[in-house]
Amino acid sequence: GFARSSDKVGVVITSTGPGAANVVGSLVEARFAGTPLLHITGQTATENLDKNQGTVHDVPNQLEMMKSVSKNAYRISSSKNVLEVLEKALEEAMTPPTGPVSIEVPIDVQRTIINRQETFNKVVINDKNIALGDLNTLDLIEEEIRKSKRKILWIGNGGKKLTSEVEKFIDLGFAVITSTQGRGVIDENHEMCLGSFNAIPKVEKFYSSLDLMIVVGSRLRGHETKDMSLKLPDNLIQIDIDPNAENRTYPSKIFHLGDGKKVLENLYERLDDIKNIDENWIHEVKSLKKEIQKDYKEFLKNY
């Protein structure tokens, strides 16, 4: 919760064995949600590591267990490399796509008394954010936006902090829809925001009439696309910080690897001369929003 609300790294400390096992579910959730998290846990003494001797705190394959649910997992083998491992783990947790990184510290290393090094006060975590990305691809995206009249942004978890940028794209004539994780990027009372009603029949029919859909920071995961059977526009552009997102669930006409904030800012600067928005298009989006809200309220009456 701290990491998600503060944009800082969360830190959790557990005991070894059952303590480490109990945090597995939370690490899975943090990884899925892209939450930057540093998990520190214990381990048996160095001389007993990986021998499966049943010594106190001995948990076979604990490091592998942590690796399976984290972005990565490290073991501090000596008090001499504490700072090095911490820096590496923090950097990895903060590098997009962000997520949890685990560190296990053998009990004898924990008990080692060391002098605090001056370098501990000057730790700088490198910002590895992917910047704007390929300018040639941005040229192609600009061209597609200029050609389109009926266009929509699909905002996922990776774009949920882009309130200002999304509002500017509404000024360019974009409607907005979100995944569940992307909710709150703008006020859902906004007339051009369809909320997270992204897979209902009326909205799917609406998709078929669109010239363009731009997906920002969303997996388009099965839960929100009817296991990838939801029909999305053929002219689909995907913007994501994760290179593995390309064609993972849906084929995209254009995939752009870059920081969503910087990409949308750059595109808006190119496109802010677009002023003549079709009033009929705006009216259609507003009418659809009223319909789906009415349908949902009727549905809730059953409960």
PLM feature segments, named:
Residues 43-68, 188-192, 251:
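Active-site-proximal loop->helix
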Residues 55-64, 231-241:
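Flexible glycine/proline-rich, aromatic-decorated loop/lid segments
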